[in-house]
From Swiss-Prot:
Protein name: Ribosomal protein uS12 methylthiotransferase RimO
Stretches assigned to the TRAM domain: 364-431
Lineage: Bacteria, Pseudomonadati, Chlorobiota, Chlorobiia, Chlorobiales
Domain Radical SAM core intervals: 132-361
Gene Ontology CC terms: cytosol
Enzyme class: transferase
Chemical reaction(s) catalysed: L-aspartate(89)-[ribosomal protein uS12]-hydrogen + (sulfur carrier)-SH + AH2 + 2 S-adenosyl-L-methionine = 3-methylsulfanyl-L-aspartate(89)-[ribosomal protein uS12]-hydrogen + (sulfur carrier)-H + 5'-deoxyadenosine + L-methionine + A + S-adenosyl-L-homocysteine + 2 H(+)
The EC number(s) this enzyme carries: 2.8.4.4
Organism: Chlorobium phaeovibrioides (strain DSM 265 / 1930)
Similarity-based family: Belongs to the methylthiotransferase family. RimO subfamily.
One function term, GO molecular function aspect: metal ion binding
Gene3D superfamilies to which the protein is assigned, alphabetical: Methylthiotransferase, N-terminal domain (3.40.50.12160), Nucleic acid-binding proteins (2.40.50.140), tm_1862 like domain (3.80.30.20)
Keyword terms of this UniProt record: 4Fe-4S, Cytoplasm, Iron, Iron-sulfur, Metal-binding, S-adenosyl-L-methionine, Transferase
Entry note: cofactor: Binds 2 [4Fe-4S] clusters. One cluster is coordinated with 3 cysteines and an exchangeable S-adenosyl-L-methionine.
Required cofactor(s): [4Fe-4S] cluster
């Protein structure tokens, strides 16, 4: 291949799991001489790593593919490849409707797409990743796939069954990330709760966490914890180890028992409340994030009000809500999508309005406190960062005005919180790293 034909623009859409897949692809390709460009206009090949989880994500993936086709038709690029979740669901349809695309590849076809761009998969590089910015924070994907059967979700169809990554392999990957300057390690999977059961016959999340903590990352954060049978020893470890963030992402989806049964979540409202109480008792400093779904098939106004009351009572520190999306490859697609779209959106907004008030109150209590902040970016003379209670991209930010020239991205500083809004903190830097 010529140098020009080795220039590739990779657009990664969707979740952090997709980001990791893209970073693995980039590391393998770069080892073969492929150069990744900042924009499509500088490349000869475009790769789109798609998301197919909900309708909006599918639409974005299709729109970006159509935009790439326009680039190809204009002669600015020669080849287009589409990979990831969307081809897992609709490969034959995509091949028919988008013949301009030169190849479609699923979530488990890394060697094939490397071949398509003139590279070769090298097993000795399977832990290597080319990190996307910012380089001080990254994700460690501890498993592939999912073996839960939540009715609203098509991930098992897209990603296959749950497969834990060996512990020693994860430690080697974490070391490679650390050597690249990563200081905040975010543990991710479709379900971190089950980690190790398939490989070792028992839950190994706590074992992994202890080993990672010994590696002296500044922050280690837990995301995507399934509530059923969550190992509470993890919370004890969290309270004992200073570099494990007092934070847990625990998607509950709903609280009504009928809906939880229909969702096939394997847990009841009573079980959810007992778990939350146990977590908070073991670690009073923890911040809990959850995700809810509004407008699930058959959800009555009374059942939704039960969800509102649940959120008001539990007072989650962070909460996101999605309007139910009727996905054709999910088990719930067999149910009638009975809640009108307008009502779904209204319920979502109502729950988020409730959470906004809770977030405002909780942030207000931080005013006057001195808190460690991780700096993510600098805009003019303002440094933007997060506390240990805020995950990248989805949670609160902290703006430190006037600190842009005194501190760099990736630094951890001590800041005083001077003001707040529902989803933002405003502070002053008190101490910068030496």
């Amino acid at each position: 291949m010529t140098e020009q034909s080795n220039r590739v623009f990779l657009l990664s859409l969707g979740c952090s799991k997709n980001t990791v897949d893209s970073e693995r692809l980039m590391a393998q390709a770069e080892a073969a001489g492929v150069v990744f460009t900042e924009s499509a206009s500088d490349a000869e090949t475009i790769i789109i790593n798609t998301c197919g989880f909900i309708a909006d994500a599918k639409e974005e993936s299709i729109n970006e593919t159509l935009a790439a086709i326009t680039e190809k038709e204009s002669g600015r690029v020669r080849k287009i490849f589409v990979m990831g979740c969307l081809p897992e669901l609709y490969r034959s349809e995509l091949q028919t409707e988008l013949p301009e695309v030169d190849g479609f590849f699923g979530t488990r076809e890394l060697p094939a797409i490397l071949t398509a761009i003139g590279a070769r998969y090298r097993s000795e590089l399977h832990l290597h990743r080319s990190l996307t910015a910012p380089g001080h924070t990254s994700f460690l994907k501890i498993s592939e796939g999912c073996s839960r059967s939540c009715s609203f979700c098509s991930i098992p169809r897209i990603r296959g069954p749950y497969i834990s990554q060996p512990l020693d392999q994860l430690l080697r990957e974490a070391r490679l990330l650390q050597e690249k300057g990563v200081q905040e390690l975010n543990i991710i999977a479709q379900d971190i709760t089950l980690y190790g059961v398939d490989l070792y016959g028992r839950q190994m999340l706590n074992d992994l966490l202890l080993r990672l903590s010994d590696m002296a990352f500044h922050w280690i954060r837990l995301l995507y914890a399934y509530p059923l049978n969550f190992p509470l020893e993890v919370i004890e470890t969290m309270s004992q180890r200073g570099n494990i963030c007092n934070y847990l992402d625990l998607p509950l989806q709903h609280c009504n028992d009928r809906i939880l049964r229909s969702m096939n979540r394997g847990i009841t409202k009573e079980g959810e409340l007992a778990l939350i109480e146990a977590i908070r008792q073991k670690n009073p400093d923890i911040r809990l994030r959850t995700t809810m779904i509004a407008g699930y098939p058959g959800e009555t106004r009374q059942e939704f009000e039960e969800l509102l009351e649940f959120a008001a009572t539990v007072r989650f520190d962070r909460l996101g809500c999605f309007s139910y999306c009727h996905e054709e490859f999910s088990p719930a697609f067999a149910l009638e999508d009975s809640v009108p779209e307008e009502e779904k959106q209204s319920r979502t907004a109502e729950l988020m309005e409730l959470q906004e008030g809770i977030s405002e109150e909780k942030n207000k209590r931080l005013e006057g406190r001195e808190i460690a902040v991780c700096i993510d970016r600098i805009e003019e003379n303002t440094a933007w960062g997060r506390t240990e209670w805020d995950a990248p991209e989805v949670d609160n930010e902290c703006s430190l005005e006037g600190a842009g020239h005194t501190i760099a991205p990736g630094s951890f500083c001590l800041a005083r919180i001077d003001g707040s809004s529902p989803y933002e903190l405003f502070g002053t830097v008190l101490k910068v790293p030496e």
